[in-house]
UniProtKB/Swiss-Prot annotation:
Organism: Dictyostelium discoideum
Swiss-Prot/TrEMBL GO biological process terms: methylation
Gene3D superfamilies according to UniProt: 1.10.220.160, 6.10.140.2220, SET domain (2.170.270.10)
Keyword flag Transferase: yes
Protein name per UniProt: SET and MYND domain-containing protein DDB_G0277331
Amino acid sequence: MIPNNINNRKKLKLPELFKEKYGFNKKGIELRYCDGEKGMGIFSNRKFNKGEKIMKIEPYVWSVAKHAIVCDECLKNKLDLEEGKTLKRCSNCKLVYYCSTDCQTKAWKIHKQECKILSTIPSTTDKKNINTKSTTMLLRLFIKRNLELINNNNNNNNNNNNNNNNNDNHITGQYEIIDGLLNHKDIRSDNNEYKSFSSGFCSLLGEDPQLKAPIVLEYLLKLEPNCITIPRCEASSIGLYPLMLFFNHSCKPNISIINNRKELLIITNKIIEKDEELFINYSPAICYRNERLDNLKQCFFFNCKCTLCLGEEKIKSKDLYITCNINNCGGRINQEIDININNNNNNNNNNNNNSNNNNNNNNSNEEILKCYKCLKVYKGQEKDEILKKKLIIKNLQNKLSTNTDQININQEFKSLLELYCKEIHPTDPLFYEIVNKTQLFYLGNNNKFISDNELSTIYHPRYQIMIKYHLLQVQNLEYEYCRQMLDYVNTLATTSYFKDALNILTDLMSNHLSQIDFYGFNRDELLSLLYNLQHEYKNNIKTSRKIIN
């Protein structure tokens, strides 16, 4: 099952493969060689408008976590099923589930070969401290490779195959793309652990570890940094999308990825000119700059040199998410080096002596606070007062780090939250943590400490502002905005805020969801939810009138 070798990356003709087999050129994009260290990238061969759909992609192989109760074929969980239907477990391995006979039939070609092996994986992989998902991914990768080899041998006269290539280890397609990936094994700090696992994996398949373990290790190190977590699926499902692997990273990408379970839809989030490279974001969309750079280095093994990072590096930008309240500006204040001081001084003092030039160099390193919106520069005492506001974030982080069951929503916490919302800019990543935590506060036992008026003035407006600003305006993720707001609609309905929930859902369905053709959402379910909210709202009004009378 395990291949005898891996194709030489230098011999692969990937640009031709992407063009001829996958029709990238017909989609308005093509694979090209890049300048510098990036190797290859995806470029546009025509102009794209904002919000334009480029392509849909399915994973080559995928996997879910051990013991996850989710359909192994379509990734539906029990909440996604129609009433009366359940997920049924494979009677043999008792590890994978299916939601229907149709899904089980689709998966059978691969599962019939992996079933016996999967049942022995837990006892093997737990000892090696390797994620079971990676084990399953490897197993399915090799099974699918063998199936493709059989198909190639049976159809070697077909024009779509690689001209009767007699090398039974050669497959022209997505598997070949995987062969061409870098493994970064020279800079991996955990190689010994993976080597141990690779030997165990060979033994599991009844193959000679001495011969095949290096091959397994090679693929394992290729898979880990190149698998994509599939959002909105239970138990952190992961997928390997070979056709996605040559989209390079930018912290300010020009395309976005929308998922409908396994399927990924690539859309533009800005106007893209012809011959412009297309970028996606490998790191979490909302995180502090140092966390973003550390994540890229640790998980993807490169120092980011995108335009955003180079610009931040040039001005020595530091994470600072404080709101500019001058004349109700509302812009974000950032901490940086004033690179203009040195230029201005040089223009005014061209005839100065060396000592003056040294002074100018010292001045050029002056740190300033600058509003990105109104361009006001804060210095001296004003700057010191602004920097003191960082304590607000620190104090709130300390509060949020406390176990949510033990936090009392007292006046101190509410005052701190109000101060945070007033002084800290909505793009601050901590807003996400606040939303998640306060949702537990307000829906848990502690909600008795909060009146309806306080609930609407503190929690709900900030939730909406944070989501709308961050996900819609900053990241241009219309889909993600809809998903988050639908979660919010359910939260409002749970707490009997039927009118608010009804207004938001009506706006979503009329505007935002219609813009993405309800992609990834069930229109009938949303119409049913809309009807139920209307019904609950009318009943709520009738009940209120009876109480008043």
